[in-house]
Swiss-Prot record:
Keyword Lyase: yes
Catalytic activity: cyanate + hydrogencarbonate + 3 H(+) = NH4(+) + 2 CO2
Family, similarity comment: Belongs to the cyanase family.
Job description of the protein: Catalyzes the reaction of cyanate with bicarbonate to produce ammonia and carbon dioxide.
Name of the protein in question: Cyanate hydratase
Gene of this entry: CYN1
A GO BP annotation: cyanate metabolic process
Enzyme class, broadest EC rank: lyase
SUPFAM superfamilies: Cyanase C-terminal domain (SSF55234), lambda repressor-like DNA-binding domains (SSF47413)
This protein's UniProt keywords: Lyase
Annotated active site: R106, E109, S132
PANTHER family cross-referenced by the UniProt entry: CYANATE HYDRATASE
Length: 166
């Protein structure tokens, strides 16, 4: 029986100049240790998406996250990386707009094509407001249909924030 190769996400060198300096170190250690975001998330007690966001500098690590992640990746206790991961993120600058990476562009295209439809349905169900991306969580799952085709299921769960009247 053939050995199944593990898929590992790595850092795209074309965006490295848009990311925090620690991102490259985290990705290098992740690759050397052959760790998936799923396995790192299990170790940290966080979601895969949240952990990946820390690697890309789009989410802030808690002191516990930074300690566990540094230990798991074998980073020096004297390294400034833990403190950097706990700093305030500069969100939304990781890639160009519109996106050029095909998968990210497809997600952008989903919002372009269905954004107003999502908004209309949310407004009908919840009233005038917005979905929080702060009080938020997300997960990515794989489903296989009856024909054997793989499908991706992306869940975006955000707190509903009604607009206030003033």
């Amino acid at each position: 029986m053939a050995e199944q190769r593990q898929n590992l996400a790595s850092l795209d060198s074309s965006i490295i100049d848009r990311l925090p300096a620690y991102s490259a170190t985290l990705f290098d250690a992740k690759t050397q240790k052959r760790l998936t975001f799923e396995s790192i998330a299990a170790h940290l007690g966080r979601s895969e998406v949240a952990v990946a966001a820390i690697f890309y500098g789009q989410a802030r690590a808690s002191p516990e996250d930074a300690e566990k992640l540094s230990r798991l990746l074998g980073l020096s206790a004297e390294s400034p990386i833990a403190a950097q991961m706990m700093g305030f993120p500069d969100r939304g600058r990781a890639g160009p707009m519109p996106p050029v990476e095909p998968l990210i562009y497809r997600l952008y295209e989903v919002v372009q094509n269905y954004g107003y439809a999502f908004k209309a349905v949310m407004n009908e169900k919840l009233g005038d407001g917005i979905m929080s991306a702060i009080c938020f969580n997300s997960k990515v799952e794989k489903e296989v249909d009856e024909t054997g085709a793989a499908w991706v299921v992306i869940t975006l769960k955000g707190k509903w924030l009604p607009f206030s009247r003033f």
